[in-house]
């Protein structure tokens, strides 16, 4: 992959952060002065790590803590697989493609276009595992279900407007007695329209075929990144499964301060509490497994033969923007600091996933928006800009040979 990008597509000037980021920053600054809080029934701190979702104790895990329930679920998946999804080699080994989708807001249009272009190239595999955070969490279930849902991704990421995601109320009122500057009712309705009973059933079917879908959220109470086993939720048969599935997607895309947190009912020792969850990007900008099961589990395949992993990461953002002088003002400086910190976090996540790949003998490939693509735009969700990013992603994927095979600064190896 050429990290310098293709020929110029537009004026490559790096703009300030989106309106959402501005709202979040303004809110954070004002809230530092201290305002009243809304009542809640939070989990006592000493019980936080023991909290589970009622009737579904095996659907999530804390990142960085191997979880026996999620590991057993993954181990069971190898016997459920269809040979048509993951053909066996002559020696009995199997290659497992994984897809990790990053956050990035409206820039998810790039990832949606890339997936569609990948399909048109004829080389898009069936993924064993799909993960997502933030906008990647909105994309992940559709990517998991495969090319049949490419058109849904295209529609969402080329026609959605800001008003389809959130609405602003009285900012002063929200700062004084609220918990966010915007109302995400429109986004919740959008998720509800696309993720219905039939959709959930298809997720469950793929889970029972040995494939796995994970979404990450940030638990603000526990200060931890949480990995949710979405296929297990879908396949649980519980009456609350559909609502829970939708809530996890919404939570992972709920930018703190700008958007309201999402509350999950949990229990400890028979008593009910609530947990406050926000955008998964707070905990990780992109993740593969979150350290919730043993790395060797794919190699071992439950004793069914050797497994090899092929890791694909789509960064729904521009990791290498061209320099752009910062205005000498408090908001401009603060916004640029947040922007730079976010990009640094992505680099760290790429190195972490790459390190896993090196240890496990897996292939590693990733893609980002080329640095000379113009990211200008005043509206947070602008169909014109998003259609342009969709087209960029589609063109790159359809052309093939677009992947980088090592993190920034590392020697690039030929793609397998």
Language model regions located:
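N-terminal secretory signal peptides that target proteins for export/translocation
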Residues: 1-19
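Sec-dependent signal peptide recognition
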Residues: 19-26
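Patatin-like phospholipase
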Residues: 36-129, 144-416
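Gly/Ala-rich beta-loop-alpha elbow adjacent to hydrolase catalytic centers
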Residues: 131-132, 136
